[in-house]
Amino acid sequence: MKVAISGGGTGGHVYPALAFIRELKKVHPEAEFLYIGTEKGLEAGIVKREGIPFESIEITGFKRSLSLENIKTVMRFLSGAKKSKQILREFKPDVVIGTGGYVCGPVVYAAAKLKIPTLIHEQNSIAGLTNKFLSRYTDKVAICFEEVSDSFASEKIVFTGNPRASEVVGVDGEGALEAYGLVSGKPTVLVFGGSRGARGINEAVEAILPEWNKRDFQLLYVTGDVHFEKIKDSLGEMNLGNHISVQPFIYDMPKILNAVTLVVSRAGATTLAELTALGVPSILIPSPYVTANHQEYNARALEKNNAAVVITESELKETDLMATVDAILTDEAKLNSMKLSAKQMGRPDAALKLVETVLSIMK
């Protein structure tokens, strides 16, 4: 069996692809894979480190308004589709999967024109431009949020969830908090703003640290590498208690997520898939800097189901974040209700469901 996969630009498109590959290998250990991405996207480094064969094409995204740059983008798309056809003819895959990002546009389009079975995976609650375009040509569209179903033909939709969810379920969180100087068994809040951190979240947390110092529950505050030294210096005279741990980055996030009580974070699709798979309540602060404001749409889907509280970044300064945390952690009924709601939204079997869907279109 040969499988070609394309997706990139951000980790949110790459990590679901890798989770799918790992799951398919369990069922078909003999399967061969080829990843098609760009050299400029995150996928180049991540995929190569995984030891997966990698081919690259050149492509940029369409602007959401009329632009001369879009003419160049069309030319790059056609060139990318031509190169993709060459790559696919040589590799001869049984199926081609797109996990989002501009790069999968020419790849999946080329595969469809070559009559190769195709599937695209939409991680967000609002469809990306590339996936909207590709859905006309693909055999199936795998989705993670019911809210996005109106963007695609109903007969093509399969609700699989995000395969990254499957990778956090069953991970042992024992000892995870101790590695960061905290204690197991105590209510613990994890705050993080993504791999690079988020200035808005950092500023809000710094403002309430004196109050947090008076609380019994623990805080694992992940600043992001870029912000760590500056924040560490500013906290030098605050005399934080042992129940507060400030870190630049967390490398064992699946273990940590299995050990914490509440999460304060952005609302990227991968993060939400992990939180719901584990039934972890959250306070979500969507990034305002993403395409089509898709993180807020993602967050509102959880809020609507009582799995999260949403605070937009523009509301952060007027919102008492400490009071929001207190309201959840000091109300056991509310906390348990949010846990249950998050768990009900989760798809811990997402990777297997996606594998089954892919295998079905190959028959």
UniProtKB/Swiss-Prot annotation:
Name of one Pfam family that matches: Glyco_transf_28
Matches recorded under Gene3D superfamilies: Glycogen Phosphorylase B
Compartments reported by the entry: Cell membrane
Principal EC category: transferase
Molecular function terms, GO-annotated: UDP-N-acetyl-D-glucosamine:N-acetylmuramoyl-L-alanyl-D-glutamyl-meso-2,6-diaminopimelyl-D-alanyl-D-alanine-diphosphoundecaprenol 4-beta-N-acetylglucosaminlytransferase activity; undecaprenyldiphospho-muramoylpentapeptide beta-N-acetylglucosaminyltransferase activity
UniProt record, GO biological process: carbohydrate metabolic process; cell division; cell wall organization; lipid glycosylation; peptidoglycan biosynthetic process; regulation of cell shape
Alphabetized UniProt keyword annotations: Cell cycle, Cell division, Cell membrane, Cell shape, Cell wall biogenesis/degradation, Glycosyltransferase, Membrane, Peptidoglycan synthesis, Transferase
Catalytic activity field: di-trans,octa-cis-undecaprenyl diphospho-N-acetyl-alpha-D-muramoyl-L-alanyl-D-glutamyl-meso-2,6-diaminopimeloyl-D-alanyl-D-alanine + UDP-N-acetyl-alpha-D-glucosamine = di-trans,octa-cis-undecaprenyl diphospho-[N-acetyl-alpha-D-glucosaminyl-(1->4)]-N-acetyl-alpha-D-muramoyl-L-alanyl-D-glutamyl-meso-2,6-diaminopimeloyl-D-alanyl-D-alanine + UDP + H(+)
Known EC number: 2.4.1.227
GO cellular component: plasma membrane
Topology in membrane: Peripheral membrane protein
CDD domains cross-referenced by the UniProt entry: GT28_MurG
Residues the record lists as binding UDP-N-acetyl-alpha-D-glucosamine: T10, G11, G12, N124, S195, I250, Q295
Pathway(s): Cell wall biogenesis; peptidoglycan biosynthesis
Entry similarity comment: Belongs to the glycosyltransferase 28 family. MurG subfamily.
Chain's role: Cell wall formation. Catalyzes the transfer of a GlcNAc subunit on undecaprenyl-pyrophosphoryl-MurNAc-pentapeptide (lipid intermediate I) to form undecaprenyl-pyrophosphoryl-MurNAc-(pentapeptide)GlcNAc (lipid intermediate II).
Protein name: UDP-N-acetylglucosamine--N-acetylmuramyl-(pentapeptide) pyrophosphoryl-undecaprenol N-acetylglucosamine transferase
Gene name of the record: murG
